[in-house]
Amino acid sequence: MEFLKKLVGDKCYLSPADATLADKVARWSNDLRVSVRTGDISDMITVDAQREYLNGMNEGGYAFYIIDSENDEAIGVIRLMRISHIHRNAVLGMFIGDSNHRNKGIGTEATKLILDFAFNVINLRNVMIETFSFNERAINLCKKIGFKEIGRRRNAIIYGNNEFDEVFMDILNTDFHESIICEVLK
């Protein structure tokens, strides 16, 4: 499958998401290692339900497939959602569905690409993420890029006999200094 190269980095590029990969995304969404981190572990996600969800993802937001630059393979999804153009903010959601591509810096680069888009194309000033206290990989990724923790909802999620906080982090446009888009304009 040929993907469009909307935002291009060294390790990955972002291609507008649609329902063509519903089978693959449904497999990822039903993978326990993915769904436990996204909070969707109890959701019953069929291919048809995933297709319907993917078809609506770009309504009121921007959704992209994360594509590995080495082999043009879709490995995850990243999106801006709950966008307020009045208050110029949004929520970012992301996962690397293919476990062979985790811990290689691709998630970091994909996050930087979508933040560049958020701040320098659609002119947002604040982007927030919501994750869980056990998801140290996501928390560390966000801290490395410049996100700051802004609050917690204590004991918000229960898995087995374990309770975990929901962690809220955000980044302002003034905290983000890695723009590919601004370089293109020079």
In which residue ranges do the predicted regions lie?
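Conserved acetyl-CoA-binding loop-helix of GNAT-fold acetyltransferases
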Residues: 103-117, 140-144
